[in-house]
């Protein structure tokens, strides 16, 4: 008999996307898709204006599906009112055949423009770049970092604004998305490190697919030699604070440190954790519940 999937569709307030997506990934063990991340319709401005978003998750129909759907409905009913939806609709379920799932899942991903020049494009999508566009090909679903998460987007925007004429260090490289963007934006030398060897393997494949050269390693941060004009770290707030001295030591005089992965409510915790480093907080950018801090080292 053909294998089938249960496609579960949730209509939720836009500001609740991250919360629900995390819950769904945990519950289903699969990735999720979010509508309206298309190139033409998505921008940070329109995201705030769009009141409702569609999030889809994919479950294998098994004995636990009913239970999981009930847990999902409870989660939505409990949390959506805090985001302004007093009467959230329960999720709907459609059964998909394996072959429809394989193509149906893909249809929810489209090329996404981030900042002015960067475009993240799924490998299967045709795309005609504008002059000056820097296109990164990336398939969702392997390592963290497909450009759809606000913490990644905030880093990419910061990186594009800074320009990357010198050397760049990407701490917690995941899919390698930030490392690849740094190369495309003109960095001379890019080093990406991750504690997860699988992520490094994926990042290497992605770099090869995009024809970019970066040094991708599992070397612990403290053991990476040299200093860099830009250091990026999109990891958890607690890790950023724990690694504050090592991250700072890697920033060249006058260079920049971009910190992401910080919930807005944890922003002051991270800022406090970097006070003793001597770096200057140059800019704070936010998207939804996520915050990104840009620090600069003295000359
Ligand atoms: C949120 S993902 C970021 C991926 C990508 N850089 C992006 O911006 O989308 C965080 C990554 O950091 C890695 N990581 C966590 N702690 C780390 C550490 N102490 N040193 C290096 N990598 C770390 C994780 O394995 C994961 O791949």
Swiss-Prot record:
A matching Pfam family: PrmA
Gene Ontology MF term list: protein-lysine N-methyltransferase activity
Subcellular location, record wording: Cytoplasm
EC main group: transferase
Residues binding S-adenosyl-L-methionine, per UniProt: 152, 172, 194, 234
Gene Ontology BP term (one): methylation
Job description of the protein: Methylates ribosomal protein L11.
Family the UniProt entry places it in: Belongs to the methyltransferase superfamily. PrmA family.
Full protein name: Ribosomal protein L11 methyltransferase
Source organism (scientific name): Geobacter metallireducens (strain ATCC 53774 / DSM 7210 / GS-15)
Lineage: Bacteria, Pseudomonadati, Thermodesulfobacteriota, Desulfuromonadia, Geobacterales
């Amino acid at each position: 008999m053909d294998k089938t999937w249960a496609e579960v569709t949730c209509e939720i307030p836009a500001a609740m996307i991250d919360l629900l997506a995390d819950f769904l990934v945990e519950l289903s063990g699969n990735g999720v898709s979010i509508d309206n991340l298309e190139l033409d319709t998505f921008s940070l401005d329109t995201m705030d204006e769009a009141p409702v978003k569609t999030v889809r998750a994919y479950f294998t129909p098994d004995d636990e599906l009913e239970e999981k759907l009930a847990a999902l409905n409870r989660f939505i009913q409990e949390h959506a009112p805090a985001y302004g939806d007093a009467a959230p609709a329960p999720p709907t379920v459609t059964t998909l055949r394996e072959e429809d799932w394989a193509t149906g899942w893909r249809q929810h991903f489209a090329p996404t423009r981030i900042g002015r020049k960067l475009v993240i494009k799924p490998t299967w999508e045709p795309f005609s770049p504008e002059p000056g566009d820097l296109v990164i090909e990336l398939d969702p679903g392997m390592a963290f970092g497909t450009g759809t998460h606000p913490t990644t987007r905030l880093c990419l925007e910061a990186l594009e604004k800074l320009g990357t004429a010198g050397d760049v260090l990407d701490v917690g490289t995941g899919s390698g998305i930030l490392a690849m963007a740094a190369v495309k934006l003109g960095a001379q030398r890019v080093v990406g490190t991750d504690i997860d060897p699988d992520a490094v393997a994926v990042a290497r494949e992605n770099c090869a697919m995009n024809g970019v050269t970066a040094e991708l390693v599992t070397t612990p941060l403290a053991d990476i030699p040299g200093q860099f004009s830009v250091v990026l770290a999109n990891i958890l707030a607690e890790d950023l604070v724990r690694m504050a001295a090592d991250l700072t030591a890697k920033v060249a005089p006058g260079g920049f440190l971009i910190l992401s992965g910080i919930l807005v409510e944890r922003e002051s915790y991270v800022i406090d954790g970097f006070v003793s480093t001597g770096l200057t907080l140059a800019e704070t950018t936010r998207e939804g519940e996520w915050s990104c801090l840009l620090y600069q080292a003295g000359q």
